[in-house]
Curated annotation (Swiss-Prot):
This is Pyrophosphatase PpaX. Keywords: Hydrolase, Magnesium. The gene is ppaX. Its EC number is 3.6.1.1. Belongs to the HAD-like hydrolase superfamily. PpaX family. It comes from the Bacteria. Pfam families: HAD_2. GO terms for molecular function: inorganic diphosphate phosphatase activity; magnesium ion binding; phosphoglycolate phosphatase activity. Transmembrane segments: none annotated. Its cofactor is Mg(2+).
Length: 217
């Protein structure tokens, strides 16, 4: 792919904001409520970060998947603002991209309202022109639907776009949409895990994006 990058699409959790402890704690409490006889360690829960809730709960406990999702969301929202953290340098890098007139969007497997809450808590909401949540698409990542919807709303093409994320769902979704892709080295599963999905770039820090988009010009 050649040409100028004008459009940057981001995953939210684990990419722009650190919700790892919130997610792990919420899963632990949910599993304790519905499956008290089974112990889920932190390592057991890591693979559940990234896929949609229903994908996870249907695999673990299909008979109670709907109830578990409702319980998870209630607990998650209640403790959301207390447990999310900012990643160093993210705000400054996103602000710089915004000020240089790049088109910025979010494509997440979270519900729209929850995405907006996280963005507002961290002050990032003012920088993103398009936000695509799970409740706005029929098919979650790695299906390209969310990316394609965001590109359409931003009046951008796949040739000028890059998808940035911390999970294989993000990289695969970008590849399926035929955009460039970037993994983040601060992913909770580690850069080695992401590297096996062969993103075009691996970011050591969010400001690395500035050099990437400028080099593409």
């Amino acid at each position: 792919m050649t040409g100028k990058i004008t459009t940057l699409l981001f995953d939210l959790d684990g990419t722009l904001i650190n919700t790892n402890e919130l997610i792990i704690k919420t899963f632990q409490v949910t599993f304790q409520e519905f499956m008290p006889d089974r112990v889920f360690t932190r390592e057991d829960i890591l693979p559940f970060i990234g896929p949609s809730l229903m994908e996870t709960f249907r695999e673990i406990n299909p008979a109670h998947a709907d109830e578990m999702r409702a319980f998870y969301r209630e607990y998650n929202l209640k403790h959301h603002d207390d447990l999310i953290l900012e990643y160093d340098g993210v705000y400054e890098a996103i602000r710089a991209l915004y000020e240089e007139d790049y088109k910025l969007g979010i494509v997440s497997t979270k519900m729209y309202d929850t995405i907006m809450r996280g963005l507002k808590v961290t002050g990032l909401d003012k920088f993103f022109q398009v936000v695509i949540g799970l409740d706005q698409v029929s098919n979650a990542k790695p299906d390209p639907e969310g990316i394609e919807m965001a590109l359409s709303l931003l009046n951008a093409t796949k040739e000028e776009a890059i998808m940035i994320g911390d999970n294989y769902h993000d990289i695969e979704a970008g590849k399926n949409a035929e955009t460039l892709t970037a993994g983040v080295a601060w992913a909770i599963k580690g850069p080695e895990h992401l590297a096996q999905f062969q993103p075009d770039f691996m970011l050591e820090k969010m400001s690395d994006l500035l050099a990437i988009v400028r080099d593409e010009e």
